[in-house]
Curated annotation (Swiss-Prot):
Pfam families the UniProt entry points to: MIC19_MIC25
UniProt GO BP: cristae formation; DNA damage response; inner mitochondrial membrane organization
Job description of the protein: Component of the MICOS complex, a large protein complex of the mitochondrial inner membrane that plays crucial roles in the maintenance of crista junctions, inner membrane architecture, and formation of contact sites to the outer membrane.
PANTHER family referenced in this protein's UniProt entry, alphabetically: MICOS COMPLEX SUBUNIT MIC25
Compositional bias ranges of the Basic and acidic residues kind: 79-88
Chain span(s) of sequence motif Cx9C motif 1: 195-205
Gene: chchd6a
Coiled-coil spans in chain: 79-166
Cysteines engaged in disulfide bonds, as pairs: 195-226, 205-216
Protein name: MICOS complex subunit mic25a
Stated family: Belongs to the MICOS complex subunit Mic19 family. Metazoan Mic25 subfamily.
Length: 239
């Protein structure tokens, strides 16, 4: 019971020594059905009269009386067979009714299971759809943020490039202006050595007096005075 689909059942039953159904293979019968089947097993024929039985017992059996039970047995045997068939058909009807009830119950349970499964599937589908929509919105938002950030950095890079170009242009202009001013201030000058005589005398003195260099100290002082005088003269003329 409760399966997703209904299948055809093959049902068999067994009879006891009184030809009553006791075992129904494949389906468990309820107590109500078993009670109904027990009621069908009850003998509907009324019991024989006790007086008549007593009269038969006091009578001396004769040849005709001896043959009576056989005749009576022959007449009642078809009735018993017919009664057995009727009882069997009643039991079969009860079984079929029970099977139909079980089948209806199984179909209803299967329908409920399928309905619940469909509802769960729909709910899950809705949840997945909502989750997909939410993820899509988050992705769109993130993509918009990345685009805005990319545009911001691109603008910053463009501004930095413009500033660097402007600085380079200004530096180049300043350099060229300074170079032009420097070229205008520079004049051709003839440089002549100063104090050449004293320089030659000092060199000769040091060669001659390598072990007594103090003898050249007066020439060295005179050479330094000559150099200082030349510096002062240069500053005065080009100051």
């Amino acid at each position: 019971m409760g399966s997703g689909e209904s299948t055809t059942r093959r049902v068999s039953f067994g009879l006891d020594e009184d030809d009553r159904v006791r075992i129904l293979r494949g389906v468990k019968l309820s107590e109500d059905v078993l009670q109904r089947m027990r009621n069908t097993n009850a003998d509907p024929r009324p019991p024989a009269n006790n007086k008549e039985n007593q009269g038969h017992q006091t009578r001396t059996p004769s040849t005709s009386d001896a043959q009576a039970p056989k005749t009576q047995a022959k007449t009642t045997f078809p009735d018993s067979k017919e009664e057995l068939k009727k009882r069997y058909e009643q039991q079969q009807a009860i079984i079929q009714e029970e099977l139909a009830r079980i089948a209806r119950k199984e179909r209803e349970a299967a329908r409920q299971d399928i309905s619940r499964a469909v509802q769960r599937e729909r709910a899950q589908t809705r949840q997945e759809s909502e989750r997909a929509k939410q993820l899509g919105k988050q992705l769109d938002k993130k993509e918009a943020e990345l685009k805005a950030l990319e545009a911001f950095y691109q603008e910053q890079i463009t501004q930095l490039e413009k500033k660097n170009e402007e600085r380079f242009r200004m530096s180049a202009e300043q350099f060229h202006a300074a170079a032009t001013r420097s070229e205008a201030n520079i004049k051709a000058r003839n440089v002549e050595p100063v104090c050449l005589n004293l320089q030659a005398q000092i060199l000769n003195c040091y060669r001659e007096n390598r072990e007594q260099t103090l003898q050249c100290s007066d020439l060295a002082k005179e050479y330094m005075q000559c150099i200082n005088a030349a510096k002062k003269n240069l500053l005065v003329n080009h100051g």
